[in-house]
Curated annotation (Swiss-Prot):
Record's protein name: Movement protein TGB2
Biological processes annotated in GO: transport of virus in host, cell to cell
Any further remark recorded for this protein: TGBp1, TGBp2 and TGBp3 seem to act together for cell-to-cell propagation. TGBp1 is the main movement protein that physically cross the plasmodesma with the viral genome. TGBp2 and TGBp3 would facilitate TGBp1 function.
Main location: host cell
Pfam family name, one: Plant_vir_prot
Compartments where located: Host endoplasmic reticulum membrane
Residues making up the signal peptide according to the UniProt record: none
GO (cellular component) term, any one: host cell endoplasmic reticulum membrane
Amino acid sequence: MSGAHHLTPPTDYGKPVLAASIGISLALLVYTATRSTLPHVGDNLHALPHGGRYVDGTKSISYFSPSASKTRDPFPFAFLLILTLSGLILLLSRRRSNPHSCPSCGTPHA
């Protein structure tokens, strides 16, 4: 052997992965919260997304808004699902009393 070999710990990618996952999650949340799912009604100059009536000399548009009973906002359900899963992960991660114990048998090894 020509010299002493030094052991180096592997690169920790935890913080960049956490930052990327938070960024992607926020982007998806903003996209789903701000997109319009209402049907497009009208032409390129006259849009009636919330209902209404437009009468011109050559055309007439009558559209009544979608009823609130038919459309449901998925945002509260998604928020509740994320909150429940986060609480479950937190509960299960704190449930282990000794983080240095063996996951197979539960006893600490040297």
